[in-house]
């Protein structure tokens, strides 16, 4: 649902970060100080998963468990297939095509996670595939025009595949030079989308 501008201006908004500042605890404290009675938690992970969205919920629960003031809580678990999100991605990508031309390949690159999460039933991998499919359909891309991959792995454990760096090396070996890398799992640009 969409809010009118007047309704949105009446909403007390705070950002809190799971691994940065301001922290989730600081954001919740500000809400308490402002007598907020209902909190909508919107983690900025479009494709929810246990290492991302679930840890955010756990952290908020851990903070609130010792408080005597507990507001109504609504958790938004993800929006990987939300039509507004898909439309926004498609619009941004179309603008990139307009500004930079149509690439030879489009690579949808998502943040990776250890493969064991998928093997244990975590839906993240499937959500990434669904987002990719919906955006590709919206853009009317044929299947040969795009691929999907995962970035940002570390350690020795096997992570979700294919890996973005391996895909880019393969493109180079196959003389595919004009590539657009799309990062639909990141709501805003950050170190992992810019580097």
Where are these regions (language model features)?
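Single conserved hydrophobic/aromatic residue that forms the stacking wall/gate
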Residues: 1-8, 12
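Short helix-capping segments at alpha-helix termini
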Residues: 10, 64-70, 138-143
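Long, hydrophobic, well-ordered secondary-structure blocks that form the structural core
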Residues: 14-88
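Short catalytic/ligand-binding loop motif for oxyanion handling, primarily in non-cytosolic enzymes
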Residues: 23, 47-52, 83, 114-118, ...
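Glycine/proline-rich loop-helix segments at beta-alpha junctions forming the active-site rim
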Residues: 30-49, 57, 157, 161-195
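Short, surface-exposed alpha-helical segments at coil->helix boundaries
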Residues: 53-61, 125-133, 195
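Hydrophobic alpha-helical segments within soluble ligand-binding/sensing domains
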Residues: 83-104
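Redox- and metal-dependent alpha/beta enzyme cores, enriched for Fe-S-associated oxidoreductases
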Residues: 102, 115-147, 153-162, 167-168, ...
